[in-house]
Amino acid sequence: MLNVTITDSAQTYLRELLEKQACEGIGIRMFVSNPGTPQAETCIAYCRPGEAEEADHVMELSGFNAYFEDRSVPFLDEAKVDYAPDKMGGQLTIRAPNSKMPKISDDSPIEDKINYVLYNEVNPGLASHGGNVSLERLTDDGMAILRFGGGCQGCSAVDMTLKQGVEKTLMERIPELAGVRDVTDHSDKSNAYY
């Protein structure tokens, strides 16, 4: 269920922005990029007719529709969009307190499951060496493409960390994952732990 508040002042501001686009039926689309991770960002974009996804949730507002990416809905729970006018014009604010919170279930997308394991199980251990690992992308054949950073980039022990730590943990927790691949440039050893 959609639990997002768009205040009257935000609706007025957004409606005025949309009217300037001179596009009949234009709305907004709200989504979270990198949901459930520390890098999560809540975004609002124009949504021209035909750009909404079939699975999007729709909120009918005064003068326009707001579309919400289905995958982002759990991360937008209790989100609030507000507009506060000031001397310089005003500011649109988006508060999404659950955007960085992992919300994983059996039917969650595999990318969310990978990010959950990386940020909650793997990275806390790597942080003791000043390192981290993140998901770059998931290939069509189910391979997780990972990038190491911090003390892990260029570290001589990264192969062992990848195979015996990261890959083993991910494969145990996410059986549908085909494997992992590291795309980090390890020739840069400036921050390497070992």
From Swiss-Prot:
The keyword Metal-binding applies. Its cofactor is [4Fe-4S] cluster. Disulfide bonds: none annotated. GO terms for biological process: iron-sulfur cluster assembly; protein maturation. Homodimer. One of its GO terms (molecular function) is iron ion binding. This is Fe/S biogenesis protein NfuA. Binds 1 [4Fe-4S] cluster per subunit. The cluster is presumably bound at the interface of two monomers. Involved in iron-sulfur cluster biogenesis. Binds a 4Fe-4S cluster, can transfer this cluster to apoproteins, and thereby intervenes in the maturation of Fe/S proteins. Could also act as a scaffold/chaperone for damaged Fe/S proteins. Keywords: 4Fe-4S, Iron, Iron-sulfur, Metal-binding. Belongs to the NfuA family.
